Amino acid sequence: MRIGRIFILSLGLIYGICSFGLAGEVMPWVTPTSIGGFNTEVYYAHSTQKVKLVITGHETPFDYVSQKVNIKGTFRPGLGLELYILAGVIGSELKNGSPSYKGKMDAALYGGGIRYVMLGDIIILPAVSFALGLTHSSSYLTKENGTGNDFKLDTTELQGSVMASKKIGMVTPYGGVKFFHNWIRWKDEVGDKGKGSGGDISLFIGGKISLTPFLSIKGEFSFADEVTYVSGLSLSLGL
């Protein structure tokens, strides 16, 4: 019995070491920028999107500008599969000529999503992954040079992406295509309300630099129908 237990424990230890090695070599963290079982990322994002709000029965185009500071936690329950949750603060602004409507950087944002690495970063092949996530935020906007809240803006965004990356030493460049769609609801101070939407497809490129095996920095930029830049710091712990 004792020999059997030692044999089983030895197999378990070998399996654990091999599994961690396989995850580290074949399934690198490309977007969160680290290798390991759990990843924590703090980042700032600034984006501009085209949206349309229905006001008094007519669609009015706006530039929806947002600034976000988020904390994102990602866990890998299985090889190639990653689940994440995020929370943070957001400041929103709607621009349509003058005046604009702007909110303070104090609104709550939260969300989550899933990512799957279909093809690992091995030898000459890049890592290829798919991601899908949902976020929600609520902001109170004030007319430019105004003193009171003119209306409340609730925004829910669905975003998906296809990404390829390749680790080259301590640097990992990546790029891909993402789609996004916004569902927007607004309500002003006198009780009038409406809805709107926006979304399209954008290209993005970025890169990470691994400062240590556990600590990385990254930068990202997307363009076309959405203009976004992202910078962040990432800490990864192997489980």
PLM feature segments, named:
Residues S19-P77:
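Short glycine/proline- and aromatic-enriched beta-strand/turn motifs that initiate or cap beta-hairpins
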Residues E25-G36, F75-G80, L119-V128, K167-V171, ...:
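Short loop/turn motifs that connect adjacent beta-strands in outer-membrane beta-barrel proteins
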Residues G36, D63-V69, K104-G112, K152-L158, ...:
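Residues that define the transmembrane beta-barrel architecture of outer-membrane proteins
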Residues F38-V42, L83-I85, P126-L132, P173-V177, ...:
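Transmembrane beta-strands of outer-membrane beta-barrel proteins
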Residues Y44-K50, E59, A87-E93, M118, ...:
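Transmembrane beta-strands of outer-membrane beta-barrel pores
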Residues V51-G57, E93-K102, Y140-F151, I184-G194, ...:
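Outer-membrane beta-barrel translocator domains and adjoining extracellular loop/strand segments
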Residues H58-V128, L132-S139:
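Glycine- and aromatic-enriched membrane insertion/assembly motifs of diderm outer-membrane
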Residues I71-P77, I85, G112-Y116, L134, ...:
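Residues on the lipid-exposed face of transmembrane beta-strands in outer-membrane beta-barrel proteins
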